[in-house]
């Protein structure tokens, strides 16, 4: 069993199983959705088996490495591997995608295409996290974009064409920078290779490393998203089906944070030391700007989308903190937001299914008719505003303390950034609790009075939210259950950065 290509299996199984969907006789989509759910569950079980029996979280090096020559002329290898940075996100992908498939249960129009695209996204997202060949990484990055575009275009709202076009333009332009920077890294020096392990060992001139860093940063800032490249996200979330939103918030945004750590931070350390303060400033802008913009949103999903932009600011600050505590907090924030974001978008979608509106002014008094939905929405909103005892609180606290204790920045800079972080933390509960008040409190609006009778959440909705809330509470109460998976890897990354920083300072002293 040890010799099986486990990573290849979990990457290819969803999309290969999805290719069988057209041959399944099913006009109403009922069989297809059970089939897709079964594929999702089976792949997630395989992931948990690999994690439980073949992954050693104490080992920071790559594990379960598979390396097959795919296109020899291009030096293109099917090279996969997992470590502490990728394993938690692979688990998150399997978990959230399976729940998103269950969340998409009401979808009946073009069900075969819909569930095939969901499974294709599943493969692409896992592929991004386990790829150890830069060209394969780019291929998986692109594979994941096409299903999102089609899911938006076919099952989106009234402005779906605009949202889908904006999404594909932003992400495609970002992808060009990945390709250009990746090719430059591969062809620099005497050895031509796309193997990330070999690319990490190459020594680049500082000016070239800075250019490479900027190229990758643009691409990953689009995906994260970071200000000012974030504007595609509210439009996409506002128009996408809520199961697609679960995948976008739960997994797709994490690809940007993961790639920043894997490539920019670990493979281009000299440039990262230069750009780290810039990342922190952008992170603070993310937190405050998105929180303030969220106040002006009338659409529930757009308001939640801006909260996602705000929360991703903490990831940038953690990555820029240059401390293990800060980086560990950034990874935990990605995991935490993946769960919380998916839950909020699912609840927004189920609320829309009943009220047929996402405009907060058209809601009101919904809590009386839908107390279970209200209770779940309140719980997930409290998780999003980082209530103590929930995962978001631990993640933000780790980032906060990690940056505050960093020896790489002056006291004045840390004081200003910490103060601004505090403002963002204060703004978050204001706009989230305001959203709850508008949608659920007060008397029932005239708009809803003229609609059909509201039906509260059923067993399916309660099951999905319970599955998402349990790990949110579990991590909040006992963070070690998550941090132990990746802590050895983040320590190694930060130690490598500190060695590079020490060498750089010695070189600067000698030159003076």
From Swiss-Prot:
It is a multi-pass membrane protein. The chain crosses the membrane at residues 4-24, 34-54, 87-107, 111-131, 134-154, 167-187, 210-230, 241-261, 273-293, 312-332, 333-353, 373-395, 416-436, 462-482. It is found in: Plastid, Chloroplast thylakoid membrane. One of its GO terms (molecular function) is NADH dehydrogenase (ubiquinone) activity. Belongs to the complex I subunit 4 family. GO terms for cellular component: chloroplast thylakoid membrane. InterPro entries: NADH_Q_OxRdtase_chain4, NADH_Q_OxRdtase_chainM/4, NADH_UbQ_OxRdtase, ND/Mrp_TM. Keywords: Chloroplast, Membrane, NAD, NADP, Plastid, Plastoquinone, Quinone, Thylakoid, Translocase, Transmembrane, Transmembrane helix. Signal peptide: none annotated. It catalyses: a plastoquinone + NADH + (n+1) H(+)(in) = a plastoquinol + NAD(+) + n H(+)(out); a plastoquinone + NADPH + (n+1) H(+)(in) = a plastoquinol + NADP(+) + n H(+)(out). Its EC number is 7.1.1.-. Coiled coil: none annotated. One of its GO terms (biological process) is electron transport coupled proton transport. This is NAD(P)H-quinone oxidoreductase chain 4, chloroplastic. It comes from the Eukaryota.
């Amino acid at each position: 069993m040890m010799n099986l290509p486990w990573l290849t299996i979990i990457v290819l199984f969803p999309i290969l199983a999805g290719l069988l969907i057209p041959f399944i006789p099913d006009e109403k989509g009922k069989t297809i959705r059970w089939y897709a759910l079964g594929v999702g569950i089976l792949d997630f079980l395989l992931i948990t088996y690999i994690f439980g029996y073949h992954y050693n979280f104490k080992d920071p090096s790559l594990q379960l490495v598979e390396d097959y020559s795919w296109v020899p002329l291009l030096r293109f290898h099917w090279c996969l591997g997992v470590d502490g940075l990728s394993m938690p996100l692979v688990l998150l992908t399997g978990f959230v995608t399976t729940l998103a498939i269950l969340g998409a249960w009401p979808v009946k129009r073009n069900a075969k295409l819909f569930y095939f695209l969901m499974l294709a996204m599943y493969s692409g997202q896992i592929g991004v996290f386990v790829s150890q060949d830069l060209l394969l990484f780019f291929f998986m990055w692109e594979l994941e974009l096409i299903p999102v575009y089609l899911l938006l275009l076919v099952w989106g709202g009234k402005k779906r064409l605009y949202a889908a076009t904006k999404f594909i333009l932003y992400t495609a332009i970002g992808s060009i920078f990945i390709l250009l920077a990746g090719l430059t890294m591969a062809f620099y020096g005497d050895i031509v290779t796309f193997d990330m392990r070999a690319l990490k060992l190459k020594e680049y001139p500082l000016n070239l490393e800075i250019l490479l860093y900027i190229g990758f940063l643009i691409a990953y800032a689009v995906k994260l998203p970071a200000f000012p490249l974030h504007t595609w996200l509210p439009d996409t979330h506002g128009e996408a089906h809520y199961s697609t939103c679960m995948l976008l918030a739960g997994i797709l945004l994490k690809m940007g944070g993961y790639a920043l750590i894997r490539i920019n931070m670990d493979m281009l350390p000299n440039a990262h030391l230069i750009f780290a303060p810039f990342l922190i400033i952008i992170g603070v802008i993310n937190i405050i700007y998105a929180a303030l913009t969220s106040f002006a949103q009338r659409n529930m999903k757009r308001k939640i989308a801006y909260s996602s932009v705000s929360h991703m600011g903490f990831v940038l600050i953690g990555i820029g903190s240059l401390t293990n505590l800060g980086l560990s907090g950034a990874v935990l924030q990605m995991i935490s937001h993946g769960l919380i974001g998916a839950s909020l978008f699912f609840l927004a979608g189920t609320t829309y299914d009943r009220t047929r509106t996402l405009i907060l002014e058209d809601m009101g008094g919904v809590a009386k008719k839908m107390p279970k939905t209200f209770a779940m929405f309140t719980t997930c909103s409290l998780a999003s505003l980082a209530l103590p005892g929930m995962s978001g609180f631990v993640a933000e606290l780790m980032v906060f303390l990690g940056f505050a204790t960093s020896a790489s920045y002056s006291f004045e800079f840390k004081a200003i950034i910490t103060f601004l972080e505090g403002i963002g933390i204060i703004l978050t509960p204001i706009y989230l609790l305001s959203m709850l008040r508008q949608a659920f409190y007060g008397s029932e609006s005239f708009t809803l009075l003229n609609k059909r009778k509201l039906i509260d959440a059923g067993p399916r909705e309660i099951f999905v939210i319970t599955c998402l809330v349990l790990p949110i509470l579990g991590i909040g109460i006992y963070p070690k259950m998550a941090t132990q998976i990746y802590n050895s890897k983040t320590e190694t990354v930060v130690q490598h950065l500190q060695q590079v920083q020490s060498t750089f300072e010695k070189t600067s002293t000698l030159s003076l």
